[in-house]
Amino acid sequence: MRAKNWLRYLKNFTLNKFTSKKIPYSAQIELTIRCNASCPFCSFPMMEENAISREMSTQQVKSIIDQISQLGVNSLSFTGGEPTLRSDLPELIHHAGVKHDLMIGVATNGYLMPKLFKENGKLNGLDYLLLSLDYPFKEQHDRTRGIKVFDRVMETIKLANQRDIKVILSTVVMKENFKYLREICELAESLNCSIEIFPCENIIRDFPNKRYIVKNVDNLIPDLSMWASTIDYLRKDFKNILTDPISVAVVQRGGFGGYPKYNQEILRCHVAEAYLFVRYDGFIDFPCKIHPIKSFNALKLPLSKIYNSLEAREIMNKHDDFEFCEECRLGCAIASSMPARWKTLASKFIMGYLRGNLK
């Protein structure tokens, strides 16, 4: 992370902690819900065509980026679906990372990244890739993702290293790949990659008139106590593991929710206030993209007005008191909440930086 990003974060942390002014620490723009893979734990392949057709235009996304920058956000990630399916991705990266000097990441399966690098050089403005890798072996990873992508992941890592772009491997831990976690960490280390290792989760995606649920996901989820003890053990041997002890404890103790007693007292969910999520169609969901109870059209309303609205603030103040928060163990929700508290910030990001994983 660049020094100016740390300074911007400290400014936002101070304002959020000691004043009535609130600023999200990070933002995500879901560029598309289209995907070229078919992972067994993901609902995107189930999405209907009429939903896919409502993607924001290039200019609409740029307008959102402008407002995210004006709001004072420190970092922005482009996700999907598969964001590399958008032909304007290099243009959007440049607009956000170069024009607005935001710290920029892209979450991708890697299938199209070699082509993007070769056609666009360095991809100016891009700081890091969050790259999916579930197995250290080609056949198993390709089978799980539903496309022949392993070789392209390896090529993406090589090209990113040549361009001084940080690569964070994202491993979804399932019963089948659990026994290969050491080999995955060894591969990540040999490739100069950091790695995030969270268990598979049953993600229900709610839309206004439709709920998408992947059947039999529970059959994929590993034993969480075994996962936790394995991560603790592996962290002793691999400094490139980003999955920190506090995140592990939050997952192991039941995740978010459990109001009024709560499943754990380590960390409340701060996603609604700390992480601004913009949907592919320009709507912003509160408290989160998984279970929106209030959605605002950011193509019609100013971003600052949405974020600072009374309705949004009331949802923020409830954190994970909602019934649907029960046992939420999403790695993205945990990581997005951690900058809101000094102790958790230190565990995840400061120690990650000192261990060399976030430089």
Regions found by a protein language model. Give the residues of each.
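Conserved alpha-helical substructure of the radical SAM core
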Residues: 2-128, 340-341, 348, 352-359
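Flexible mid-to-C-terminal extensions adjoining Fe-S/redox cofactors in radical SAM and related proteins
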Residues: 18, 23, 264-266, 283-359
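Residue-level marker for beta-strand->alpha-helix junctions and adjacent short loops that shape enzyme
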Residues: 34, 49, 83, 111, ...
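The −1 position to Zn-ligating cysteines in a subset of zinc-ribbon hairpins
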Residues: 34, 38, 268, 324
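Conserved residues at the C-terminal ends of beta-strands
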Residues: 45, 79, 132, 198, ...
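Hydrophobic/aromatic residues in well-formed alpha-helices
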Residues: 61, 227, 303-306
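Radical SAM enzyme [4Fe-4S]-AdoMet core and its adjacent flexible, acidic
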Residues: 122-128, 132-285, 289-298
